[in-house]
Amino acid sequence: NGWNENKNFILLGAVTWAILVFIVGSLNSYVI
């Protein structure tokens, strides 16, 4: 049960980072 929660947390973190990187990349390309 603990492993399942940890895996979900890691997956959520990966998705969050992917979205942040995408937003930052879009802002940089827009500014430049």
UniProtKB/Swiss-Prot annotation:
Keyword Iron: no
InterPro entries xrefs: PSII_PsbZ (IPR002644), PSII_PsbZ_sf (IPR036512)
Superkingdom of source: Eukaryota
Keyword Acyltransferase (UniProt): no
Signal peptide interval: none
Membrane topology: Multi-pass membrane protein
Membrane spanning stretches: 9-31
Keywords, comma-separated and alphabetical: Chloroplast, Membrane, Photosynthesis, Photosystem II, Plastid, Reaction center, Thylakoid, Transmembrane, Transmembrane helix
Cell compartment(s), UniProt: Plastid, Chloroplast thylakoid membrane
One record GO biological process: photosystem II stabilization
Subunit structure: PSII is composed of 1 copy each of membrane proteins PsbA, PsbB, PsbC, PsbD, PsbE, PsbF, PsbH, PsbI, PsbJ, PsbK, PsbL, PsbM, PsbT, PsbY, PsbZ, Psb30/Ycf12, at least 3 peripheral proteins of the oxygen-evolving complex and a large number of cofactors. It forms dimeric complexes.
Family stated for the protein in its record: Belongs to the PsbZ family.
Function: May control the interaction of photosystem II (PSII) cores with the light-harvesting antenna, regulates electron flow through the 2 photosystem reaction centers. PSII is a light-driven water plastoquinone oxidoreductase, using light energy to abstract electrons from H(2)O, generating a proton gradient subsequently used for ATP formation.
Protein name per Swiss-Prot or TrEMBL: Photosystem II reaction center protein Z
Species annotation: Euglena stellata
